[in-house]
């Protein structure tokens, strides 16, 4: 009976290790080029090609977010930025939740973070 328990425990450990290896291997890394391209095709129209915020989308409306705003960048986590992208904002930004998958969101958020650091470097 003891050998059966040892075998069962060994099997569970092996399956757990295999599962962890698979999940780590399947998780895609941030792709800077993809983040830049997604921004250019989806965000730049309102937020400006360089991320400095564009003109209001509608008369009397707020200006789109300036991603060079260091305080804004520091006050929000990557998860908060992803939620804004996924859900949109009441200020006129539409929801992009059905457009981007998790890996694309990570790449896009990484690009938004780079916009702030690029301005700081100038």
Locate predicted features.
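Electrostatic cytochrome c docking/interface patches
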Residues: 23-38, 54-55, 122
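Conserved beta-strand positions that form and line the central face of beta-propeller blades
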Residues: 25, 50, 66, 92-95
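Detector for the c-type heme attachment site
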Residues: 27-28, 46-52, 86, 98
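The canonical Cys-X-X-Cys-His
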Residues: 39-49, 108-112
């Amino acid at each position: 009976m003891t050998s059966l328990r040892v075998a069962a425990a060994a099997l569970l450990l092996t399956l757990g290790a295999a599962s962890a290896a698979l999940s780590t291997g399947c998780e895609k890394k941030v792709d800077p080029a993809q983040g830049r391209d997604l921004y250019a095709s989806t965000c730049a129209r309102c937020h400006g090609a360089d991320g400095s915020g564009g003109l209001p989308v509608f008369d009397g409306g707020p200006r789109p977010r300036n991603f060079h705003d260091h305080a804004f960048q520091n006050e929000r986590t990557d998860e908060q930025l992803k939620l804004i992208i996924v859900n949109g904002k009441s200020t006129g930004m539409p929801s992009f939740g059905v457009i981007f998958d998790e890996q694309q969101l990570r790449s896009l958020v990484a690009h938004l973070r780079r916009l702030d650091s690029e301005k700081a470097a100038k």
